[in-house]
């Protein structure tokens, strides 16, 4: 028998997944008695619930319950493969502690901040919630209301949220947990190209000659895409892989150029590579002259800490951290000329030979390069700079917007791209890259939404970390969290978030499927439907929009986040939320409910129930009397059509395994900005970065600046946080899957064995991890998948019994406001 390399890789992937979950694999599976048909399982397509890869899965339903899933052979993304988490999707909805009814803190029969959680009806839950929101609106106005959403929201849910908050409550205090993972990437796209999202796609994996991973452990965090990297590398001897990280991990095992650098010095390495390209005469001057302009970024931009923090006061000299000034190629070359091989090697701790080999991957005009990055770059106090500096390398060499030449920002959540970014649930955004600060774009949104001009406020709201601080300070008093475990995920959560949640002036609502750390800190818990318990749509990292039908009912009284927002809107009239001057100028809106204004507005409600799939239920549509999801999608789509964000008609998505936008004349776009590949590029332009008015991309000159909190004599160890293969984010789903729990039941403090020996710790010893903000206990791990350099420890954050974010620093990139979870100083002490 012969076996192809691809089949071998598939078998290896299945074996790794099985071993991770302690599942024995038989050499030959037994036949099903009576054949597969006898199982009477109905199969339907859906995208995976977990990361932003967007794998297609087939979901098996029997007797109203999801009983099995498997990789979708027709899905281009994963071609039938799943990672170990994907194999257990059928179990994520059936944890023993699934929430099935609203829970309100009560004492003596009434709501009390210090009361016990008590089951209540949806009517009482919403009545209490509405009364609290109206109290805050009356006493402090709309800026005291906030909502924290998610890159796991469906496109419909995110769109409903941005309408409810901006057009309904007139508050821009809406932000997603994607602030913690993708904000730096989004800002860098906008600052460089004038449009968000990657220009390439997953097809680049089969065309590239080199893969450079910047702060990305793809083998564990994007394992299905990693199989495509491995297939390309192992099947083509000329292909090279470089992996840059602050410690050695599973992705490093495939690396031809394994690089471990000192935390924060990736900025210097990036400037060294740019200098190498210039000094060796490999700049593509024709491309640079025709398609780019140069700018210099503001420096001394601080660390996004509170204004009175001494570190912030010492580091911040720039008035506007996001400011840029026109520059030239010569000025750029002068700045990067300081980053010599010897200087950067000493600063970063990387061997000169590895740095030279890395630089040559980019400099070689005959080698196509795919750069890949995720949290190591984005969770960085200079994350926007880091993203833009990678674009510098691709723009200097012209290696961009064509098969195999691709700077590619990987995404961590299922719809961080499709919902958080494209729908516009960040504090400053509207759909399709529009912003609330632009009066023309606000007016565009108001016309599409059929609301009066002037309703949408122009001031950006509070970002994620600022929301925690405002809750703590008592200036944000009504707060609704959906589809995320924010308290476990927040940096410095003991110092900022926890006191804010329990501030007696604040009312906290959490919509979730399980009693998470965040839910248990709330005042009201609303039970939420999950994944295929609702009709949904996600947008993945390659701009692919994928839609699925509702396949099963949610348990008990659980309801989707979309239903919750729409139903909540029925409890408010415009008189209660809009100012008198708007109502006086538009008297026909006076007295209308927010539901009528936002959802039963002649646009969202224009598709009746006859358009529903007769086989699959749609809870929201049946509740409100019209096809809710189709109406929301078709109202949202015009934001992007004709503007480079074109979506296909909604019904089309039910027939395909996703389409990559822009979808023009029924055809998806794989590579953007290149003539012949992108319909928006004008004939004769060759390459056109049409997001910017001049059609050119920006190359930015910025220096290396050090992290906010380096180790010192007392706190002498770098702490890095992150994830592991078996668990996803805070573990609220995966820790309830028995096989995944057994595979990795608790977080560990990964440590260099020599550091452990010097400190007197044996393998498995319990230790205290202490920072200036807080401490936790964990156990030392000196073996296994993560091999730490001296002076660095790694702790994953999935374990609710080890809240490592008690320890982390709430520093953010001052441009993107994204949190740096990768660099703070700790000490390791015995228990």
Curated annotation (Swiss-Prot):
UniProt enzyme class: oxidoreductase
Single GO cellular component term: nitrate reductase complex
EC code(s) of this entry: 1.9.6.1
Signal sequence annotation: 1-31
Catalysis performed (reactions): 2 Fe(II)-[cytochrome] + nitrate + 2 H(+) = 2 Fe(III)-[cytochrome] + nitrite + H2O
Pfam families named in the record: Molybdop_Fe4S4, Molybdopterin, Molydop_binding
Main location: periplasm
Cofactor comment text: Binds 1 [4Fe-4S] cluster.
Record's subcellular location: Periplasm
Positions bound to [4Fe-4S] cluster: 48, 51, 55, 83
Annotated residues for binding of substrate: 797
Modifications after synthesis and translation: Predicted to be exported by the Tat system. The position of the signal peptide cleavage has not been experimentally proven.
UniProt record similarity statement: Belongs to the prokaryotic molybdopterin-containing oxidoreductase family. NasA/NapA/NarB subfamily.
Record-given protein name: Periplasmic nitrate reductase
Lineage: Bacteria, Pseudomonadati, Pseudomonadota, Alphaproteobacteria, Rhodobacterales
Gene (UniProt): napA
